[in-house]
């Protein structure tokens, strides 16, 4: 849930021009039977994670929706749906000129990779398609990321950023292709 909150903030708000100091979030949990102690424990851990994100980014969760009792009975006992967390967000764009897209804008522009990366392939499409079963799942450093987001926003509002794209599905190669194809 922490990484999901992070992705919403980074990919859907900050990258396109929202002020990182003026964002809000909404949560949606889809889970199995909360009367099952293990399932209730999963909910507690999810809530702890999004509370950490809300504190770190000073981004309140102002509303949400919870969908529980998503399970079914079988001869072998109940089966809960996998825990699913959806984070939606909104941000303040102080100047419409600061809203940018993800496609490459000008030839001979410099491309920068910002942020910190680790060997974290767990849960990725690459890991799934290449049989990597023991990869580390992505972690996030909220405090470091917030400082990065503020620096990025400063560059953006100074007119130094022409376009931006998150690196998620498919990594750097897919991101570069998406930026090139969409322009």
Task: Identify the residue ranges that each predicted region occupies.
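Conserved phosphate/anionic-ligand binding catalytic regions in large, soluble enzymes, centered on
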Residues: 10-19, 103, 110-111, 162-179
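Acidic/histidine-enriched ion/cofactor-binding microenvironments in catalytic or ligand-binding pockets
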Residues: 75-84, 94-116
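Catalytic palm subdomain of template-directed nucleic-acid polymerases
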Residues: 28-39
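Generic beta-strand/beta-sheet core signal
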Residues: 16, 23-28, 60-64, 88-90, ...
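Glycine-/charge-enriched secondary-structure boundary and capping motifs
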Residues: 39-53, 57, 62-85, 134, ...
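Gly-rich Lys/Arg/Thr-decorated short loops/hinges at beta-loop-alpha junctions or inter-strand turns
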Residues: 1, 84, 123-139, 156
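A general structural motif
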Residues: 5, 88-94, 139-149
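Short, small-residue-biased leader/transition segments that mark boundaries at the very start
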Residues: 2-8
